[in-house]
Amino acid sequence: MAYANSGGVKLHCEETGSGHPILFIHEFAGDHRSWEPQIRYFSRRYRCISYDARGYPPSDVPDDAAHYSQDIAVADAIAVLDHYDIDKAHIVGLSMGGFAALHIGMRHGQRASALVVAGCGYGAPKGKQESFQREVDVLADHFERDGSEKAAEVYAGGPYRVQHRNKDPRGWAEFR
């Protein structure tokens, strides 16, 4: 298993294929395996790199909340590129990973050949922000009180994934 180091945190990463590199950044509640179908296809012509974000084993899981932020997520992705001596790559991210990819493009544009940013923001329209904040607070309480395994069930079945369930019932069932 390969590990990149980002500020003392070990990030599990994998590489396959050859050619111009593509860095895949996974979504919340996913991991490097989320990209397996894409990597199987693109590794025929590209050097594909995926990794588990901090907090997602086998990457390190720091206890202190100060070790998690959008700035740190960007630094982690750059650390993975540096681990493989990659100056420039296509950056592909989904949801949480899409937000990181977007910020890589804004802060480290010279490192990105292209950005593929999918579902990078949940947010809420102005009229629903208070309701959205309450839902997020309830989910955060579940994670803190019950741990990630039980909270994942709340997340998978809650309003956070209703659009996934509506658009792709088979994919949603697999996600659960």
What residues fall within each predicted segment?
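Residue-level detector of beta-strand structural context in well-folded domains
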Residues: M1-A2
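Conserved HGGG/HGGXW glycine-rich cap/lid loop of the alpha/beta-hydrolase fold
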Residues: N5-A66
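Short catalytic micro-motifs in class I SAM-dependent methyltransferases
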Residues: E27, S95, F99, H103, ...
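Active-site micro-motifs of SAM-dependent methyltransferase domains
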Residues: G30, G55, G98, Y122, ...
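Active-site loop/oxyanion-hole signature of alpha/beta-hydrolase fold enzymes
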Residues: R40-S43, I49-V92, M96, R107
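Conserved alpha/beta-hydrolase catalytic His-Asp/Glu region
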Residues: G127-S131, R145-R176
